[in-house]
């Protein structure tokens, strides 16, 4: 049974009405609409979560006012796509799809460069802590070559990681194993920046060792 809308080319639907219509489109993928006596077809394009509204010609009213029919469909389409026609939304999606791999590749390169520059040979004698605090969160072993990483992007708490295990995570674009955030260069910390807090029993940024927030 078609969805019947009381809608004109000048009317703006409420967000609740639009969300209800989006839900119908997402569930059925293709749904027939009747708008002011004119038949239209609503399509949901799932891979970009956008909507296309197409006039369905056939009746005398459609043939006599084809332009008005198209404008009505376009207005509804723009509202469903939050200000874009489907073609505009598709072009924007393609532009973002082309840009994202390049951007992520640049970020990954920056992270790897920082990992390599901050890596160091791990020696237990260099640290005033029990060996258990030197275990890598990935391998659960003390690394031969390690690098300090923040526990989250905005955390002042750090952990020691195995260089090779961390490099593999970056290569796979895997999230941070503790915070589940995407890795960013700011998470990588040099050995000189870290200090083991004997009271709290964790590594933290040297400048903020007295006000570290546990994360």
Swiss-Prot record:
Interacts with PDZ domain of host GOPC via NleG8's C-terminal residues. InterPro entries: Effector_NleG, Effector_NleG_sf. One of its GO terms (molecular function) is ubiquitin-protein transferase activity. It is an enzyme of class 2 (transferase). Residues 136-189 are annotated as: RING/U-box domain. This is E3 ubiquitin-protein ligase NleG. Keywords: Host cytoplasm, Secreted, Transferase, Ubl conjugation pathway, Virulence. Its EC number is 2.3.2.27. A motif (PDZ-binding motif) lies at residues 213-215. Belongs to the NleG E3 ligase family. GO terms for biological process: biological process involved in symbiotic interaction. Effector proteins function to alter host cell physiology and promote bacterial survival in host tissues. This protein is an E3 ubiquitin-protein ligase that probably interferes with the host's ubiquitination pathway and targets host proteins for proteasomal degradation. Can ubiquitinate ubiquitin, giving rise to polyubiquitin chains (in vitro). Does not complement an nleG8 deletion in C.rodentium. It comes from the Bacteria. It is found in: Secreted; Host cytoplasm. Pfam families: T3SS_NleG. It catalyses: S-ubiquitinyl-[E2 ubiquitin-conjugating enzyme]-L-cysteine + [acceptor protein]-L-lysine = [E2 ubiquitin-conjugating enzyme]-L-cysteine + N(6)-ubiquitinyl-[acceptor protein]-L-lysine. Two sizes of protein are detected upon expression in C.rodentium; only the smaller protein is secreted. Interacts with host GOPC (human protein). It comes from Escherichia coli O157:H7.
